[in-house]
Amino acid sequence: MKSGFVSILGRPNAGKSTLLNALVGEKVAIVTSKPQTTRNRITGVLEVPAKKKQPAAQIVFVDTPGVHKPGTQLDRRMMQEVYDALEARDIVILLVDASREMKIEETEELAGPAELAESQVSEARPGAPAVAETARKGDWRSEDEFVLNLVRKLDCPVFLAINKIDLIRREQLLPLIDSLMKQFPFAEVLPVSARKRDGLEALVEKLVEYLPTGERYFPPEQFTDQPERFLVAELIRERILMETGEEVPYAAAGVIEKFEEPAAQPAKAKKPRPLKGGGFAEVKLPVTNISAVIYCERDGQKAILIGKGGAKLKAIGTSARKEIESLLGTRVFLELHIIVEPGWRESRGFIDTLDWRKQLEDMAARQADVVGEKLGED
């Protein structure tokens, strides 16, 4: 058997989370059209059955925030998540957006090398190659170079996955692959469409080929290491991203304050009651009670999140509840509150509280305190 960790790296909106969900077959990462949707490392586990000339394998995929030059403390924390994901890995997938690369190529052809070099002066970074040297490298730009500098330091196989091939013409693909191959000695280059699931089988086969021999890291039935509380908070944030615009989605964060699971159901399930006209009455599912806080930075953002007569908050809650019910397999009572936390994106302490790993540590510490108090009373 083979097993190992595969980190998925790329610029914002390359389709990393869509690829992760498609590979795992479960929604473990939220997906929107807005950049910087992913803020944490997201783990997805894929069980690969053995087949002719291929052993069974467990691939632990790690989705990462979009690689970008950090501005706020939140940005820096997101980039730290990227660095951490690159430390514990056996293979790295560098994912690029084929449609974006082709647009860059067309823009460069229209502008010409001189105009392009002039336009990129503001993008130069300390220690980067001269602007004239990097102004035109096939389809490569300084933002891509920033991503590539991360993988140049790695000592593991790096795959180039060219995503969104369904958005470009077939005759454009080979020249694009040739252009991108000039940038780095990638171990493998694979065109894929995460949205349409094209090329994923070939990608998985190649990953298994490169993975080391080893045992499973997770039980076969487990598809992520994220707790349900975090998944629920992310689903709420996904709806905020989709329901609001401008700066509001980026200034919003969700924290689950209460997560009350229904009592354990009896082993013998209740059978549906037959109806007179045929069919069966719907069996009511148990209810999970959830209370969540949405944090934003300004009163104006809070007003937008609430909307006229509370309409926006209701829409966020209704759509999020449906997603959460699908995740949990229960009915859900969802209560949302909004709190203004000025400048939270620059507060390291506050950002720590949003990390689900830190939340689990705090919960464990509180439970230990309660147990200690009870033992002391006895």
Where does each model-flagged region fall?
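Conserved C-terminal guanine-recognition region of P-loop GTPase G domains, centered on the G4
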Residues: A50-P55, R77-A187
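Solvent-exposed alpha-helical segments within well-ordered globular domains of core cellular machineries
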Residues: S7, N21, N40, G44, ...
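P-loop NTP-binding site
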Residues: E228-D378
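Conserved, well-folded catalytic cores of nucleic-acid-processing
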Residues: E26, V45-P49, A85-V92, A98-S99, ...
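Canonical P-loop GTPase G-domain recognition
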Residues: P157, D166-F223
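Conserved G1/Walker A P-loop phosphate-binding module
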Residues: M1-E87, V96
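Active-site glycine-centered loops adjacent to acidic/histidine catalytic or metal-binding residues
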Residues: D63, N163, S193
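Catalytic P-loop NTPase motifs of RecA-like helicase/translocase cores
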Residues: T38, H68-K69, M102, I168-R169, ...
